[in-house]
């Protein structure tokens, strides 16, 4: 089995974080964030990152309430995932992203204080955490 390259997105209505990971190591690293207008990104930027990394799979974070129920943003994230598949033909997996942003902010703050909490960095770090959670769920 060849190890897969996997891209992850942390969906948001104003910013969408992106991370890349390698199945062999089970690790992920933040790449960048994309500005979004009510959840709609610049699809050319998304296409550029997909072409550059040529992922075997794309994981999209699914924002759920703490009790596991869906919220309005959940449907928007599903729509984003469906559009990724429809536009680019990539295989999609959804991953529960509860508390990923909180954890990303804590990690960045610990490493650099308030200056490290720039929105784009937080979203990209959240995408990396989402992907690492996905890896953990695959190999339990």
UniProtKB/Swiss-Prot annotation:
It comes from the Bacteria. The keyword Cytoplasm applies. One of its GO terms (molecular function) is nuclease activity. It is found in: Cytoplasm. Its main location: cytoplasm. InterPro entries: RNaseH-like_sf, YqgF, YqgF/RNaseH-like_dom, YqgF/RNaseH-like_dom_sf. CDD domains: YqgF. GO terms for biological process: rRNA 5'-end processing. GO terms for cellular component: cytosol. The keyword Hydrolase applies. Pfam families: RuvX. Keywords: Cytoplasm, Hydrolase, Nuclease, Ribosome biogenesis. Its EC number is 3.1.-.-. Belongs to the YqgF nuclease family. PANTHER family: POLYNUCLEOTIDYL TRANSFERASE, RIBONUCLEASE H-LIKE SUPERFAMILY PROTEIN. Could be a nuclease involved in processing of the 5'-end of pre-16S rRNA. This is Putative pre-16S rRNA nuclease. It comes from Edwardsiella ictaluri (strain 93-146). The lineage of its organism: Bacteria, Pseudomonadati, Pseudomonadota, Gammaproteobacteria, Enterobacterales.
